[in-house]
Swiss-Prot record:
Record GO biological process: 'de novo' IMP biosynthetic process
Name of the protein: Phosphoribosylformylglycinamidine synthase subunit PurL
Active site: 54, 100 (proton acceptor)
Family recorded in the similarity comment: Belongs to the FGAMS family.
Cross-referenced HAMAP family: PurL_2
Name of the gene: purL
Pfam family name, one: AIRS_C
Pathway: Purine metabolism; IMP biosynthesis via de novo pathway; 5-amino-1-(5-phospho-D-ribosyl)imidazole from N(2)-formyl-N(1)-(5-phospho-D-ribosyl)glycinamide: step 1/2
Amino acid sequence: MSLMLEPNPTQIKEERIYAEMGLTDEEFAMIEKILGRLPNYTETGLFSVMWSEHCSYKNSKPVLRKFPTTGERVLQGPGEGAGIVDIGDNQAVVFKMESHNHPSAIEPYQGAATGVGGIIRDIFSMGARPVALLNSLRFGELQSPRVKYLFEEVVAGIAGYGNCIGIPTVGGEVQFDPCYEGNPLVNAMCVGLIHHEDIKKGQAHGAGNTVMYVGASTGRDGIHGATFASEELSESSEAKRPAVQVGDPFMEKLLIEACLELIQSDALVGIQDMGAAGLTSSSAEMASKAGMGIEMYLDDVPQRETGMTPYEMMLSESQERMLIVVKKGREQEVVELFEKYGLAAVAMGKVTEDKMLRLFHKGEMVAEVPADALAEEAPIYHKPSKEAAYFREFQEMKMKTPKVDNYKETLLALLQQPTIASKEWVYDQYDYQVRTSTVVTPGSDAAVVRVRGTEKALAITTDCNSRYIYLDPETGGKIAVAEAARNIVCSGGEPLAITDCLNFGNPEKPEIFWQIEKSVDGMSEACRTLQTPVIGGNVSMYNERSGEAVYPTPTVGMVGLVHDLKHVTTQEFKQAGDLIYVMGETKAEFGGSELQKMMYGKIFGQSPSIDLEVEAKRQKQLLEAIQAGLVQSAHDVAEGGLAVAIAESAIGAKGLGATVKLAGEATAALFAESQSRFVVTVKREQQEAFEKVVEAIQVGEVTNTNEVTIHNEENEVLLTANVDEMRKAWKGAIPCLLK
């Protein structure tokens, strides 16, 4: 029980207690001006979380405004729990990606698990049924015992939550680089389906309507989680372990069903997840978005610990809780609905007209703050930006092609690089078939999930090559979006829209802010050219350990529409005799490549270049060919270059190989990472029809020899590799490193 006396308003100011909560002197002065008096301890807490970068985006808003956020299919853009895109037939797809990086660095199992739980709540709070989960993970090198521990625990946490709740984890990506050693990135994405008339908003309309708290009880976990996520990790972060929340997937499963049932009733006015900043953000945001106020009686909050103060209740980030507004007089039916699922639903306040958030506890008013001041009026900072010193140096480097002596050994070594190697060790822990809608399981370019009751499906992917973005943030930003779209197209989908998770270092450092600005410029341009608007996302700053920032990692989560299940395409070769085509030119581009990192132990120079108009044209041609039934397999050429893409297409097949002839200098032809390229196979009898639609070069054919042989133009053999040997190297790499 906490008997600690809270400091009074004068002490808060004189002893600068607000600074410990993350507020600056200027911000505290603004609060004093807004209120016309000094704030008390609880009110200072409300402002400190709502004005943190994590909740207010005060450092990133000017940059985020550059994203294109509208389109003919967009039903809901940024600003609600998740974005929504129309997919026809009165149906829509709802999706969002969020980070849980800081909690996962401290307490990896619960950090990752509650990241999954939180993103699921964002989806069903919109009225949608969650149908798929994905993730994008970054770790240091697996040789480090600490990294092994983080990797194993994060994957176990994602699996533990997703498997228990019964939503399939259908895809994702995992990359390894030394810069993530002390600060892993854990980005979780959830996708849901909804009928247009069921869309709900997090808005508290109707004065006199009742504010209800539903779900799990409130404890002291996660207090100041939003503030913790707005500072750099350090040795003292370990002491902040209590700030990591604990998840209960079985409770959340019940919460999903109860909320989706409630959404079908006309008693519900508005609903929002209690995520970052818990009760504070949900109440202030719902009131502010509706232009209303809210009064809450905190004695009625279900509490699982004794003696909790208003400050603790308002700032707790306990999991599996929602705030709802219901029509006055309908409270009892809501209570009964939740009781049926064994969940609490408690009336704890009402909507008012005066735009104030008022909190009462033990008969006294303990806070009175304008809702807009918390939700909308955080100061916006235009941070200084300065080109990173390394950028000019990398741009001026004369790039040489790495010297490779043995092409086969190099290919086998690349297949064992953890970023390229099979992630089966990861996804075998996930239930990716639950609910039986998964058409394409993890391991191909994109996951594909059918839309029940139709012939349609969703193609879903997460992508980001942060090495390219480090070398050249603007070009790398373009590539991140383009690669996501490439993966969707290779799976037979038409790219619809993206959600993003912008993971960066400390924005107060001008060179980091420059990375943020430039990568968003690149992403925005790619989104416009490829017609994939940004419908929501998340910003995670301060990803640094001991002053070293992670690579700039703006992860892209993209959803595409497969108009007919018969268009679904995968990367593995299908039958001997099929012709192999390469779309796109190969240049000697090795900056940020797997080959460069493997040979030199670091990355440098220029990232691969990209022409977005060319990218868009190629994607359109390939999608047309797939929809016309002319394509057997399609795979985008990414890390490791053409040799790896061809190897992966053979590894995924059974008993098939390939014989291929590549033009140009051998090392570049095999391993360069030029953009906008695809490996496509076509039935011989469809050669003419395919070549009418698609500009591509035929480079060889699929064989039944179980070997991949690659020749140069003079017909000299560059490499011959047995497919079983390649599969063993590729599949065994990560388990071997974990021993």
